[in-house]
A protein has these predicted regions:
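Generic, low-specificity signal for short hydrophobic/alpha-helical stretches with a mild N-terminal bias
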Residues: 3-4, 11, 122, 164, ...
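Residue-level signature of transmembrane alpha-helix interfaces in integral membrane proteins
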Residues: 32-35, 144, 202
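Charge-rich, low-complexity amphipathic helices
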Residues: 67, 146, 204-205
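C-terminal helical cap(s) of enzyme catalytic domains, especially alpha/beta-barrels
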Residues: 199-212
Length: 212
């Protein structure tokens, strides 16, 4: 996959998405342009990723709590990939690509208020795409726009308030303790690399400076 010319213009990073049963159920893939302003074909990118993460891959399925008034976020049945497109141009390209329902596209909360982004989010959701809201918007989203998001993403330093309409996922878990804390806080999945314990503090004595 990395030899594909399309990916030669991108920097890739990945982490595991883990559920409450401690099973790896999906992958979180971060894509960043190798150079600012690089033009990436979102449709071609999604097609390429679809070949790497096919329908037969492991799947995450969540049942969302309905919104007041009868609305509700779409389910994530069959989700295999959480896609974090770093950079405004790349995100726009991905949002405007044909929907791949098993891929969940992350959208930063501070961008959702932009009319072009909101329109792309609505169109992708209407086409069957899955979306995650990353962070907390400054103001409450309109119900129709909020319902486009199946999941809301947080990190330990800025945990989201409980009781929101979307299922919560925590990013950046780096240890089993981080993982347990995420689930204790009410998150349904966590993304990161929490395998193995963090290094133990050094017990070596500090060198004593010679007397003058």
């Amino acid at each position: 996959m990395l030899e594909h010319p399309l990916l030669a213009r991108l920097v890739l990073g990945y982490s595991a998405v883990i559920d409450r049963q401690r099973s790896v159920v999906a992958t979180r893939l971060t894509l960043a342009p190798e150079s600012p302003g690089a033009d990436v074909d979102g449709a071609a990118l999604m097609q390429l990723l679809g070949e790497v993460w096919p329908d037969t891959a492991g799947a995450l399925s969540l049942r969302m709590r309905p919104l007041e008034g009868g609305g509700g976020a779409k389910s994530t049945a069959g989700l295999t990939l959480m896609l974090n497109a770093a950079g405004e141009s790349l995100l726009h390209s991905v949002l405007n690509a044909p929907a791949v329902p098993r891929f969940m596209v992350e959208v930063p909360a501070f961008m959702v208020s932009e009319p072009l982004v909101a329109a792309s989010v609505q169109a992708l959701a209407d086409a069957g795409g899955s979306l995650a809201l990353k962070g907390q918007p400054r103001e409450a989203l309109p119900a129709a726009l909020s319902a486009c998001f199946a999941m809301q993403l947080e990190d330990a330093a800025s945990a989201l308030p409980k009781g929101g309409p979307q299922a919560r996922a925590r990013l950046g878990v780096r240890s089993p303790a981080d993982l347990e804390a995420a689930f204790a806080a009410g998150c349904v999945v966590a993304a990161g690399w929490p395998f193995g314990d963090p290094p133990a503090p050094s017990t070596a004595k500090k060198a004593v400076a010679p007397e003058l």
